[in-house]
């Protein structure tokens, strides 16, 4: 009723702020510390080179509020396994120039595809994998669906709670606030939901100036846009994939994982892993090294059992049963 009383002009004036990529001014390229996009935007980049012979290369897409350092701990472990890891601050996050503003899923996905192409060109002949955490998982699915080339996909607590999952009431409320008061703080952040059981990691996040501690409603509205794209793309995933879920995750609940499993195509070279004591930020958890080791093992052999035994067949019974019907 309230929305019906607002004129189209008023709604347009209060539309969510989106800052997509601008016109092309340069050829996209990587430096030692940044990804320079075609529109000249400089996005900070972190690289953790493999120690010894390089067996694989990973490109990480971080989650909502996070930035490139979100992959620091696992990347150091993967480095010892011969895996090089790249991660850049996505537009709107970390030290990006448009921090706190949504870039739009099309721009975010195009960045991911471009960086993937640049990374693959720097490592010819080396197996290339895409890993996305939370929001990054949704973006990774969308990017693969739109042509990103990779040898496999790793989804850590993928955020797939789009409109189909949350329902019309919640999504309608978010649309209303996003189009009337887009500047309004969106409320509790992921830190308020205890995203990890690791007190040192949690304290670091709380004091990290590059973590996005407060977001606008229109950023949350954009996140739903990304989750919608990821959910839709999940139906058509055509790569080997490893999906990881912590049973203590308060941001991506088990029901969301079940919904995702129901629509993802069955593949003998893919795995679902449940961590009984895992939270949302699995790779920052106390058992983060265990999760990182599982990822490295899967990259080495898609069909072998994971070292931790977290494979769905050996963990949460109800979801394992559902997963079994998809094999």
Located regions from the model:
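The serine-hydrolase catalytic nucleophile loop
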Residues: 64-76
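Catalytic nucleophile-loop/oxyanion-hole region of alpha/beta-hydrolase
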Residues: 65-68, 93-127
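Conserved alpha/beta-hydrolase
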Residues: 75-99
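An N-terminal hydrophobic leader/cap segment in hydrolases
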Residues: 5-37, 41-50, 319-327
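Short alpha-helix in the alpha/beta-hydrolase fold that links the catalytic acid
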Residues: 239, 253-263
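Catalytic active-site module of serine/aspartate enzymes centered on a nucleophile-bearing elbow/loop
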Residues: 271-327
